């Protein structure tokens, strides 16, 4: 198990289309590494494999206060959604930037769990938003893609400043 480097925009690896996982046993170490990486952050609640430079269609989410209730989604897809609303989002790959994004507040997501068993999640709470955000990463999309060009520029300035400060 290892804490991996989280890529930051505009790294082109964040734009890669994820590949479906066909052998769940072969990604168990990656799942552990994704969880270790998520838990090593101060405020992360979700992480997708592309954010650490991997192409597998895997996301991990943990909304629990104690960070001890991980949700692992392999090959997830949003099969339906309703009731769009604006809500503030941030992203570990776009550090120090938050913006309002329109998302479904109610979704149905289908995926495989860590053991490879089919899973269907119907939710109308914060998890709905987080799942959409993380699943977007699997298509090479970031939350800032939903923003105006001006706001995208502002986001990238903040990211560059964050990366520069971190390098000191």
UniProtKB/Swiss-Prot annotation:
Keyword Oxidoreductase: no
Domain of life: Bacteria
Keywords: Hydrolase, Iron, Metal-binding, Protein biosynthesis
Active site (catalytic residues): 134
E.C. designation(s): 3.5.1.88
Pfam families named among the record's database cross-references: Pep_deformylase (PF01327)
Positions that bind Fe cation: 91, 133, 137
InterPro entries named among the record's database cross-references: Peptide_deformylase, Peptide_deformylase_sf
Chemical reaction(s) catalysed: N-terminal N-formyl-L-methionyl-[peptide] + H2O = N-terminal L-methionyl-[peptide] + formate
Cofactor: Fe(2+)
One of the record's GO molecular function terms: metal ion binding
Top EC group: hydrolase
Binding note for cofactor: Binds 1 Fe(2+) ion.
GO BP terms, alphabetized: co-translational protein modification; translation
NCBIfam families, alphabetized: pept_deformyl, PRK00150.1-3
Function noted in UniProt: Removes the formyl group from the N-terminal Met of newly synthesized proteins. Requires at least a dipeptide for an efficient rate of reaction. N-terminal L-methionine is a prerequisite for activity but the enzyme has broad specificity at other positions.
HAMAP family according to UniProt: Pep_deformylase
Family: Belongs to the polypeptide deformylase family.
Record's protein name: Peptide deformylase 2
The organism of origin for this protein: Vibrio cholerae serotype O1 (strain ATCC 39315 / El Tor Inaba N16961)
Lineage, top ranks: Bacteria, Pseudomonadati, Pseudomonadota, Gammaproteobacteria, Vibrionales
